[in-house]
C-alpha cells in the first residue's frame, strides 16, 4: 500500500518554511523581497 506523503506538522512546517527561517539567510530574504514585490498577501508559512 502507498502511504500519504504529506503528514502535516505545524512545527516542522514553520522551521522549514517559516518567516524567521527565511530571514535567517540571504537567499531567504530574497524570497521575501520577491514575494513583497509581487504583492503576496502571505509572505511565508
Swiss-Prot record:
Gene Ontology biological process terms in this record: translation
Superkingdom classification of source: Bacteria
One MF annotation (Gene Ontology) recorded for this entry: structural constituent of ribosome
Keyword set includes Ribosomal protein: yes
InterPro entries from the UniProt entry: Ribosomal_bL34, Ribosomal_bL34_CS
Annotated segments matching region Disordered: 1-45
Gene3D superfamilies: 1.10.287.3980
The keyword Membrane appears for this protein: no
Native species: Staphylococcus aureus (strain NCTC 8325 / PS 47)
PANTHER family: LARGE RIBOSOMAL SUBUNIT PROTEIN BL34M, MITOCHONDRIAL RIBOSOMAL PROTEIN 34 FAMILY MEMBER
Protein family membership: Belongs to the bacterial ribosomal protein bL34 family.
Keywords of the record: Ribonucleoprotein, Ribosomal protein
Cellular compartments per GO CC: ribonucleoprotein complex; ribosome
One Pfam family of this chain: Ribosomal_L34
Protein name: Large ribosomal subunit protein bL34
